[in-house]
Amino acid sequence: MRIPVVASILLALVSHTAQAATSITIDAKQNCIQNAVTPGPSYGNSVAFQLAPGRYVMSLSTNTMSCTGGSGCVIDAVHVVGGMGSARWGTTVTKQPTVVDVGSSAPALTLWSFITDDVCADNSGQATLLIQTVN
């Protein structure tokens, strides 16, 4: 019973989003932060972007990311951190719409997006992080 209610709320939020959207490309190799369990330096860098305070719906609109050289190990989520709101300490974004609140009185706040893996070097593909403003 609870899942249909949550799905209905997310669907309602998605249907009330503005026409303008922001798309950010996440690269499975270049934007991969290597897991702290694996010795050695971190592999890639996060993607930084700024959003004005407000409510957003985020999802992966396209995704071809995989690990182990594309041999079936699908990477189906990206992490979003920052914004002084609901993603302040991090949230996971998949193909399912996720509501993210960006708070503060600042005109724009920085958020970062990345994936994590224990071995980033064999990752391939990209995903598009779609960000839509909720009216």
Mark where each language-model region is.
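Acidic, Ser/Thr/Pro
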Residues: 20-135
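Positively charged n-region of N-terminal signal peptides that target proteins for export
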Residues: 1-4
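N-terminal signal peptide c-region/cleavage motif recognized by signal peptidases
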Residues: 15-17
